[in-house]
Amino acid sequence: MPGQEFERDMVHAWNAYAETYGKKLIAYRHYQMRYQPQLFDVLVDSRPNEFYLALECKSIDPSTVSQLYFKQHFSAPKGIHQVIRESEWLSLSGRNGFLVVELRRGKGKHTSCFFVPWRSVSYNFKAGEKGIDSEIITRCPSCDKRGGKYTFDDEFIEQVVRMLDSYPKDAKKAYKKKWSK
């Protein structure tokens, strides 16, 4: 299952980043309870707001779809669409949300993931768009999969932090805080 594997890859990438760069954060999969709607796939917990994240992971083959469709790639149990449910949860929890889209390009080509700010997802949904166009997705911060895994560095994380909805948005200040080892 590409989706579940991608979720595990995200958890490993965030936890490896924390270990490598001495950040106090922990990432884990947010498992779906039976008969309950799921809220985000991966959560990242940390005292600094910069790493207090909720990630919705989608893994797609770009040769088969031109965009990420709201009806096809998101759920709507009990008539409440996943984007609405997760947007409300972000508002209540204070987390920063990202739609992390993995583009599987096939054998011999590199696989990449893109961090789309949740505000873009919510805006497109509320505007009545069919989905999120590939142009929007590919303009967001991205990371390539190498050696079978994603590896984040400070430069990539700074790009992600600049996309946050809440403050502070200065990644350098986040790194100097007492929360670093």
Give short role names for the model-derived ranges.
Residues 110-151:
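Short, low-complexity, polybasic intrinsically disordered segments
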Residues 42-44, 51-63:
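Conserved catalytic cores of phosphodiester-cleaving nucleases, focusing on short active-site segments
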Residues 137-181:
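Charged phosphate-binding loop/patch that engages nucleotide di/tri-phosphates or the phosphate backbone
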